[in-house]
């Protein structure tokens, strides 16, 4: 396309209020309604509107289409704080915002298809390429079901992963295909114990045509060498490999859930007096050494998780910019380091919520208790294949031992 309104824009020079500070101003809304979000099994429209009002979905959206083109680490840091208030809202909002960055990897024409019609459009996604796309004149056709489409009821488009048929003597290639919400139905399949409010339902497509310009292959996305990256050739943000970014947002929800659990636990235990006969009545919980140790362990775990996650995503964006300037290259080892940090930060988060939840007593079983909710939500994050340490850790070990790493990086 030749529309100069889409030309890459220079960075803004006006004073910048960091996104994490803007989240702090609205966090109480999400915290006070976390149980209602869980019970409704979706993030309410009022939450999306509040986040839109503070520019949450613009932070890593390209300036050429009205976004801020900011730092990915800034989104991850803000999403930790948002998830501390409500993990379901953080999971959905983090993905919806990060998908603005992912859309920027597509050809400019695809970006215009989405944002020219609706500058506020948001995208959900279903990442497992379990269906085969059928070749058609000028594109592909999709039919079938795409599960785990988090935030699908809050989105106007979806990124549906599928296998493209091989070209000539080539091999089948996994890819994302952009589909508008008007061309799929949503099947209610999300009835779960953790992250219940993420509306991660199933998309149903029936012979949907997707033009070729709305396709982004996995090899391009995971390497960081994408059509959109070439369009934004001077912006390191849009040349980061896919899996240095998206899983960092997923991990931030687990880290944030643990951070929120710690704050709630300290607030509750600080004024709690025991009633039980075993522990002895009328004793302050805060004076028990075991409680003190659990608080210390959780705090150290949360701090370590934050440090690892934020360090690695900042390193990834800096390295991408250095690659554009010819000063460095983004190697497989660099991509694996990002995957290691993302997953291990969630492992630390699980350690934190386990230490806290194990000592909440009978009152901790109540569904209104934020610690038990954070424990369930953080464990749900840890079940995601991108965060599962058994899957990611073995991949890292394979590489360190001279073997080919088996997994997504």
Swiss-Prot record:
Q: Which GO terms describe its molecular function?
A: acyl-CoA dehydrogenase activity; flavin adenine dinucleotide binding; monooxygenase activity
The record's listing under InterPro entries reads: Acyl-CoA_DH_C, Acyl-CoA_Oxase/DH_mid-dom_sf, AcylCo_DH-like_C, AcylCoA_DH/ox_N, AcylCoA_DH/ox_N_sf, AcylCoA_DH/oxidase_NM_dom_sf
Pathway(s) it belongs to: Aromatic compound metabolism
Out of the domains of life, which is the source? Bacteria
Describe what upregulates or represses it.
Answer: Induced in the presence of gamma-resorcylate.
Report the enzyme's class at the first EC level.
oxidoreductase
Q: Which UniProt keywords apply?
A: FAD, Flavoprotein, Monooxygenase, Oxidoreductase
Membrane-crossing segments per the record = none
Query: Which reactions is this enzyme annotated as catalysing?
Result: resorcinol + FADH2 + O2 = benzene-1,2,4-triol + FAD + H2O + H(+)
**Entry EC number(s):** 1.14.14.27
Q: List the disulfide bonds.
A: none
Q: State its role.
A: Involved in the gamma-resorcylate (2,6-dihydroxybenzoate) catabolism. Oxygenase component of the resorcinol hydroxylase, which catalyzes the FADH(2)-dependent conversion of resorcinol to hydroxyquinol.
On subunit structure and binding partners, the annotation says: The FADH(2)-dependent resorcinol hydroxylase is composed of two subunits, GraA (the oxygenase component) and GraD (the reductase component). Both subunits are required for activity.
Family per similarity comment? Belongs to the HpaH/HsaA monooxygenase family.
Which protein, by its recorded name, is this? Answer: FADH(2)-dependent resorcinol hydroxylase, oxygenase component
Q: Which organism is it from?
A: Rhizobium sp. (strain MTP-10005)
Organismal lineage? Bacteria, Pseudomonadati, Pseudomonadota, Alphaproteobacteria, Hyphomicrobiales
Gene responsible for this protein: graA
């Amino acid at each position: 396309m030749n529309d100069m309104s889409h030309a890459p824009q220079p960075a803004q020079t006006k004073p910048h209020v960091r996104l994490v500070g803007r989240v702090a101003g609205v966090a109480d809304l999400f915290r006070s309604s976390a149980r209602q979000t869980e019970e409704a099994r979706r993030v309410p429209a009022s939450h999306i509107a509040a986040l839109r009002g503070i520019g949450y979905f613009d932070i890593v959206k390209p300036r050429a289409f009205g976004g801020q083109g900011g730092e990915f680490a800034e989104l991850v840091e803000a999403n930790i704080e948002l998830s501390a208030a409500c993990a379901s809202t953080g999971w959905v909002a983090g993905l919806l915002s990060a998908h603005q960055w992912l859309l920027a990897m597509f050809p400019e024409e695809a970006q215009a298809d989405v944002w020219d019609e609706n500058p506020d459009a948001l995208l959900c996604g279903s990442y497992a390429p379990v269906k085969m796309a059928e070749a058609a004149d000028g594109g592909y056709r999709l039919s079938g079901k795409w599960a785990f489409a988090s935030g699908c009821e809050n989105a106007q488009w979806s990124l549906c992963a599928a296998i493209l048929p091989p070209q000539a003597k080539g091999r089948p290639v996994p890819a994302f295909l952009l589909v508008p919400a008007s061309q799929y139905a949503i099947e209610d399949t999300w009835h779960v114990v953790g992250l219940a409010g993420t509306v991660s339902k199933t998309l149903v497509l029936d012979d949907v045509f997707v033009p070729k310009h709305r396709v982004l292959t996995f090899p391009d996305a995971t390497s960081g060498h994408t059509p959109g990256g070439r369009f934004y050739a001077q912006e390191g943000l849009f040349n980061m490999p896919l899996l240095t970014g998206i899983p960092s947002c997923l991990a931030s929800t687990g880290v944030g859930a643990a951070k929120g659990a710690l704050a709630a636990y300290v607030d509750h235990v600080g004024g709690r007096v025991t009633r039980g006969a075993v522990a002895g009545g009328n004793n302050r919980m805060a004076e028990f050494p075991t409680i003190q140790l659990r608080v210390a362990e959780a705090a150290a775990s949360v701090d370590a998780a934050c440090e690892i996650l934020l360090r690695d995503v900042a390193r990834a964006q800096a390295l991408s910019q250095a690659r554009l300037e010819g000063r460095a290259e983004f190697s497989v080892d660099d991509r694996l380091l990002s995957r290691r940090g993302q997953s291990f930060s969630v492992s630390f988060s699980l350690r934190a919520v386990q230490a806290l939840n194990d000592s909440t007593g009978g009152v901790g079983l109540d569904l209104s208790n934020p610690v038990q909710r954070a424990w369930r939500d953080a464990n749900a994050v840890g079940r995601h294949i991108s965060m599962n340490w058994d899957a990611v850790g073995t991949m890292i070990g394979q590489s360190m031992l001279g073997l080919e790493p088996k997994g997504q990086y």
